[in-house]
């Protein structure tokens, strides 16, 4: 597609193969915002290699068939990760809040995820290049996050009180090792990092939203419950206390 994708090194031969693959989204495993506010992506190179092998088999079978139709990668079924490359829209209806007489705000969940950034499918394949550029643009992602949290008037992502949200931490890709990238989501790694799983969630857990530009906002342990099933996760408040992470963070969950 002629694009150097986020998080990839064009000087590496294996990663060049992914960059120029017909369907690079087959290797896409999720995006997240790191503690510095930078958008990063997780790639599994084996995914695109398997996709290319499947494409080659399909083309070979079509070439030996009696039909005159020429098979290409475009004739393959749509890959489930293709939607992750479309420009996203914010599902504001998945989060509602009600204020009690005491002034405290309680969350009323109508979706498994709060502030969900969900894919919006495009109808024309020729729009994929532009939408991919937009999605991988850190400014575009930050704008979507600010819109999700009702702070689109600000130049920096701003926090909502953690007690009104459902902070979660982890990943289901199984190939991220550091704490900030999702390590510690299993029982063994949680014990190693002195982290105790407090909830479970399904789907992608893809990042954090910096609390303020200076990163000095304190976190809170008053976390809303999450009743989903899936990978073990660690609450943000618990993580901040035990891993000595100074600023409070809210992890955003995406479901492919």
UniProtKB/Swiss-Prot annotation:
InterPro entries: Adhesin_P1_C (IPR004940). Residues 96-112 have a biased composition (Polar residues). It comes from the Bacteria. Disulfide bonds: none annotated. It comes from Mycoplasma pneumoniae (strain ATCC 29342 / M129 / Subtype 1). Belongs to the adhesin P1 family. Residues 56-72, 155-179, 211-222 have a biased composition (Low complexity). Residues 56-115, 149-235 are annotated as: Disordered. This is Putative adhesin P1-like protein MPN_132. Transmembrane segments: none annotated.
């Amino acid at each position: 597609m002629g694009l150097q994708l986020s998080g990839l090194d064009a000087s590496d031969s294996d990663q060049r193969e992914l960059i120029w693959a017909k369907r690079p989204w087959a290797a896409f495993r999720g995006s997240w915002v790191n503690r510095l506010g930078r958008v990063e992506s997780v790639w599994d190179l084996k995914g695109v290699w398997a996709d290319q092998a499947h494409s080659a088999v399909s083309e070979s079978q079509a070439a030996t068939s009696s039909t005159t139709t020429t098979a290409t990668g475009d004739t393959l079924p749509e890959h489930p990760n293709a939607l992750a490359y479309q420009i996203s829209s914010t599902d504001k209806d998945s989060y509602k809040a009600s204020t009690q007489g005491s002034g405290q705000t309680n969350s009323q969940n109508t979706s498994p995820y709060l502030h969900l950034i969900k894919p919006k499918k495009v109808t024309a394949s020729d729009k994929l290049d532009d939408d991919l550029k937009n999605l991988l643009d850190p400014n575009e992602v930050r704008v979507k996050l600010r819109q999700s949290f009702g702070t689109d008037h600000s130049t920096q992502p701003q926090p909502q009180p953690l007690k009104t949200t459902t902070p979660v931490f982890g990943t289901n890709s199984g190939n991220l090792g550091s704490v900030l990238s999702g390590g510690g989501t299993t029982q063994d790694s949680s014990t190693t990092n002195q982290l105790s799983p407090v909830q479970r969630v399904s789907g992608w857990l893809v990042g954090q939203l910096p609390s303020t530009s200076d990163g000095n906002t304190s976190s809170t342990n008053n976390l809303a419950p999450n009743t989903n099933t899936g990978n073990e996760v660690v609450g943000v408040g618990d993580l901040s206390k035990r891993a000595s992470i100074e600023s409070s963070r809210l992890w955003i969950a995406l479901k492919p």
